[in-house]
């Protein structure tokens, strides 16, 4: 099996665990009290399962609490972000992307705590 690199980000890190022509799977870890940018993708949809922890998920105009075992569908073109609400524990997410392109340049950021817009 292929060993994939860990990619560090200001909010945590991710590791790609599977990649094919139309599917990419990642494990994402969000550090306590950190959040991903508010973003959308033009060329992929995402399916998330919360493996460990809890957070607040924004999809479109709605925000809701998510916790272990929760499933989130993010349609192509839909703005989204997740925040780890824990003071001390990581938020771990399994992410499956379906689409035609998985490059990091298909992340269109709207808001970002780390000045990456």
Q: Residues of each region from the PLM?
A:
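A short glycine-rich, His/Asp/Glu-containing loop-to-beta-strand
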Residues: 2-40, 44-45
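Short acidic-glycine-tyrosine-enriched beta hairpin
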Residues: 61-79
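A generic "binding-loop/recognition-motif" signal
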Residues: 32-34, 43-44, 62, 78-79, ...
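Double-stranded beta-helix
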Residues: 2-9, 81-117
């Amino acid at each position: 099996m292929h060993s994939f690199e860990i990619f560090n980000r200001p909010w945590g890190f991710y590791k790609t665990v599977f990649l094919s022509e139309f599917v990419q799977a990642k494990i994402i870890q969000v550090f306590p009290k950190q959040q991903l940018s508010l973003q959308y993708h033009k060329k992929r949809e995402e399916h998330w399962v919360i493996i460990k922890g809890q957070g607040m998920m924004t999809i479109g105009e709605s925000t809701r609490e998510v916790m272990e075992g929760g499933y989130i569908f993010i349609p192509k073109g839909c703005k989204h972000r997740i925040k780890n609400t824990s003071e001390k524990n990581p938020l771990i997410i399994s992410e499956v992307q379906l689409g035609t392109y998985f490059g990091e340049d298909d992340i269109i950021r709207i808001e970002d705590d780390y000045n990456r817009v």
